[in-house]
Amino acid sequence: MIVVTGGAGFIGSNLVKQLNAQGRTDIVVIDDLTDGTKFVNLVDLTIADYMDKDEFQARIVSGDEFEEWDDGIEVIFHEGACSATTEWNGKFIMEVNYEYSKDLFHYCIEREIPFIYASSAATYGGRNDNFIEDPKFEQPLNVYGYSKQLFDQYVRRWMPEINSQVVGLKYFNVYGPREQHKGSMASVAFHLNTQVKQGDNPKLFEGCDGFPDGGQMRDFIYVDDVCKVNLWFWQNPQHSGIFNCGTGRAEPFQNVAEAVIKHHQQGAIEYIPFPDHLKGRYQSFTQADMTRLRGVGYDGEFKTVAEGVADYMAWLNRA
């Protein structure tokens, strides 16, 4: 069985979709459906089983071998987390993102099960120079980023003793289908689309940190491309480590807004004051250093903002 934690969430459900496209349906989704709206991400997918994340964690900790699943667990894609960068309940974040990840990690390395997990570019924080997979370049701005940083550090300490595949992927700004349940944490493309559909102009922040209005830049990566990287590592088990998962290109938020406007053929960008609560806690620039990912042989192409947002708009506004 293939296990996808967070499988009803944004990246997890897209990963299940790509696995289905490869003919794999022996998939167990692990998630927390307290927010029942996430079920819509699964209705067009084929899976073998679903399990609540708390039950799964309890069975993992107890050393359960999941004999009801044929041949046990083949791989764990660990996409489940509290991904809200605005969540400041540190106890909750550390339990869900750090402790849970450690439990899965130890279960996998003890049984030599491939373990591919979601890290985050939030570990880099407000740096605007080096986005290289090295602790000296990490300075997270929020407790979410810290929880991801700490788990990366934990994995790095264990790596010399591990005989099976362990891969951490530092996701940059991911956008695309099946993120509607994320509310305020959904991508800028999602929110701008909603604004234009409601007859409003798409709104971007005024300039800050030396960037012009709408000119703050991020490494935006389409969710399909993120899933392809995950699956490539699983198919290349000789590679382990922590890798950036971005495009290597920083593009301004203005490019996202222009792609949304182009799809709808209406609207003009409006600039709004930069929120006080984000000052000093905002990444005005991110750009993945792709040296390590390319160095292990990943040669897939990444959509530009214009290409990816066009695909996403077609999906969001389908009849």
Curated annotation (Swiss-Prot):
* Binding sites annotated in the UniProt record for NADP(+): 10-11, 31-32, 38, 53, 79-83, 148, 174, 182
Pathway listed: Nucleotide-sugar biosynthesis; ADP-L-glycero-beta-D-manno-heptose biosynthesis; ADP-L-glycero-beta-D-manno-heptose from D-glycero-beta-D-manno-heptose 7-phosphate: step 4/4
Question: From its record, what is one biological process in GO terms?
Answer: carbohydrate metabolic process
Catalytic reaction(s) noted: ADP-D-glycero-beta-D-manno-heptose = ADP-L-glycero-beta-D-manno-heptose
Annotated keywords:
Carbohydrate metabolism, Isomerase, NADP
The cofactor binding remark recorded in the entry reads: Binds 1 NADP(+) per subunit.
Q: Name one Pfam family in it.
A: Epimerase
Cofactor(s) required for function per UniProt? NADP(+)
Name the active site residues.
Answer: 144, 182
Write out the transmembrane intervals.
Answer: none
Which residues are listed for substrate binding in this entry?
173, 184, 191, 205-208, 218, 282
Q: Which EC numbers characterise this protein's activity in its record?
A: 5.1.3.20
Q: Which GO terms describe its molecular function?
A: ADP-glyceromanno-heptose 6-epimerase activity; NADP binding
Q: What is known of its domains?
A: Contains a large N-terminal NADP-binding domain, and a smaller C-terminal substrate-binding domain.
Q: What does this protein do?
A: Catalyzes the interconversion between ADP-D-glycero-beta-D-manno-heptose and ADP-L-glycero-beta-D-manno-heptose via an epimerization at carbon 6 of the heptose.
Outline the subunit composition: Homopentamer.
Q: Which NCBIfam families match?
A: heptose_epim, PRK11150.1
Q: Can you tell me which family this protein belongs to?
A: Belongs to the NAD(P)-dependent epimerase/dehydratase family. HldD subfamily.
What is the recorded name of this protein?
A: ADP-L-glycero-D-manno-heptose-6-epimerase
The organism named in the record is: Aeromonas salmonicida (strain A449)
